[in-house]
Amino acid sequence: METVNEPETGEVSKDAVIVKQEKNNEYCLQDIDDKLSESAEDDGEDDTNDEDDDEDSNPKKNTQAPLELMAEFLRAEMAREYQLAKKLCQMILIYEPENPEAKEFFTLIEEMLLMEKTQNHEQDGENSDEDSSGESKGESDEELSDESSDEGEDGS
């Protein structure tokens, strides 16, 4: 009668699994290194102008406006400094020409600037009307006071 060690035949030892995983990792790492070196060497061109080439050849490359610029834009918008907000929004659109929020804000800011401009013209018009009407009102007040003083003299 032979005794068979069932746990050893049915199970793989932990050490064997670890060794196998280490071998797989070595192969994976080596494959990755090989692929990286191949991709770096395959163009055979001078890499000094890669930054310029990447921008021209890859128009879908996402360039984002600096967060500081966006934060400054929001501060200007919240403070209702629309001239500054418009300039900052234009700068954001230079970085991100397809930014839908910046496009929307730009049109709204232009509308707000037009509204402010018309309000300023109306206020200037009212101020000039008040100045001219104030003079005529002052003249009429003087005439009334002259008449009342005349009446006082006539009545006595």
From Swiss-Prot:
Residues 29-66, 116-156 are annotated as: Disordered. PANTHER family: GLUTAMATE-RICH PROTEIN 2. The gene is ERICH2. Residues 39-56, 140-156 have a biased composition (Acidic residues). It comes from the Eukaryota. This is Glutamate-rich protein 2.
